[in-house]
From Swiss-Prot:
Entries under HAMAP family matching the protein: PEPCK_ATP (MF_00453)
Pathway annotation from the record: Carbohydrate biosynthesis; gluconeogenesis
Protein family membership: Belongs to the phosphoenolpyruvate carboxykinase (ATP) family.
Entries under Gene3D superfamilies matching the protein: 3.90.228.20, Phosphoenolpyruvate Carboxykinase, domain 1, Phosphoenolpyruvate Carboxykinase, domain 2
A single GO cellular-component term on record: cytosol
Source organism: Eremothecium gossypii (strain ATCC 10895 / CBS 109.51 / FGSC 9923 / NRRL Y-1056) (Yeast)
Protein name (record): Phosphoenolpyruvate carboxykinase (ATP)
PROSITE patterns with a match to the protein in the record: PEPCK_ATP
Gene Ontology molecular functions: ATP binding; phosphoenolpyruvate carboxykinase (ATP) activity
Enzyme Commission identifier(s): 4.1.1.49
UniProt keyword list: ATP-binding, Decarboxylase, Gluconeogenesis, Lyase, Nucleotide-binding
Keyword ATP-binding among record annotations: yes
Amino acid sequence: MSPSKVYQTPEEKIRAELGLSSGVLTIRRNAPAAVLYEDALAERKTAISSTGALIAYSGEKTGRSPKDKRIVDEPTSSDNIWWGPVNRKASEKTWLINRERAADFLRTREHLYIVDAYAGWDPRYRIKIRIVCCRAYHALFMTNMLIRPTEEELAEFGEPDFTVWNAGQFPANTHTEGMSSKTTVEINFRAMEMVILGTEYAGEMKKGIFTVMFYLMPINHNVLTLHSSANQGPNNDVTLFFGLSGTGKTTLSADQHRKLIGDDEHCWSDYGVFNIEGGCYAKCIGLSGEKEPEIFNAIKYGSVLENVVYDPVTRVVDYEDSSITENTRCAYPIEYIPSAQIPCLSENHPSNIVLLTCDASGVLPPVSRLTPEQVMYHFISGYTSKMAGTEQGVTEPEATFSSCFGQPFLALHPMKYATMLAEKMSQHNASAWLINTGWTGSSYTAGGKRCPLKYTRAILDSIHDGTLAQAEYETLPVFGLSIPKAVEGVPAELLNPAKNWVEGEGKYASAVSALASKFTENFKIYQDQATEEVVRAGPQI
């Protein structure tokens, strides 16, 4: 793929790989924010917000395109990949066509941007990433999201371990073998490259690298990659938070009393926990300074706001406006969070594992303590609710399951990650909890109430100070979950959903049965590889 010749600079190498003569276009490597702002403002719908953040528009695609994710079927990785709906196969011929198509487009641009940076804060495991793109906003986004090298590290950067070719403004050819749309996000583990066509959504770069880490870390280093946030308390106790979008993973890990290790992507090694990223990618819908001050105040010069609506006169962002997308986002360096732990790693192993779910059925309790087998079951299940209202005709929230709380990003079979997690929890004596940040008293559609954030934070405080581990518990039928009878700062009537159900315990039993059936049906695809103890840890109808 790449010429064997040794080049003096990364810019020279990129010119050679794209077949460009010297001076045909401008290549900016690791450009500062000010330069990227200047270039970005030439693009349509780009502006500077009242707080100094760069406002950018990602075009037609305002979210990831998981059905267009491809992994090249090649001999060095094929036997390890979890093939199926998550990881669709692309032939090596298709890869070559798409890579050349991306190169053809990139060589026509006026400016190209290179971002050389790292994935992984632990120097023992970090990999060198090179981003090649043609939108300044993409370059600033990845400058924020990757770990920025020092001047000395950049001078000695050398060859990257993995390269992303982002030609997202240009579509894939739908007549190419294996293409189902004009979008493709394609990873080749033999070439150690990724190609993006047909989507300008910046999150595709971030999550593509996440998939690479989900493959390389377990396979090459026996290091567990996790879709989680992490923080560390004053006593050096580490907590991991697992949860799908909208469950509160980013919000709850940003705690003024604890140091933030990271908000989304981590690895758990024999030496502790480290963040994969150098930034945060927070959801902005409904954001306010009162509810989430650390995130709100991080939106300033150097940050990237994506697909938000703003007042064209004052440039004040309306975080309640979802007319472009519900998936409004902001990407900022992790140093913008005052409580961030820099470097973003801990030599301490997690003492608490928190599985977050936003249960719109109202069935699951605000908090329950999990056995090791229940952790395996609920980690593999990865349950939450996809909320109604974002699609025409959808009137009921939908139960959704995402194995390991990160199914779209997994490279290996979920049981591989679940087994590694169970082994590490056992080795380091970690406690595990299931927290429902969703509805209580009834379902979303039948008058239930969202569990207030202040109560969820009180629950976390009781986990971190050790009092919840010493509490008295009762068992929730069917799911077999252990529920505390009292938590300081939380009304006792909220803790047991059966006793709190507005329509009475009889109606609650019906709701439990309905949700339990969905869990059981979902788990069937993993049952043949799970132990009998793990299967029994699920709901018993």
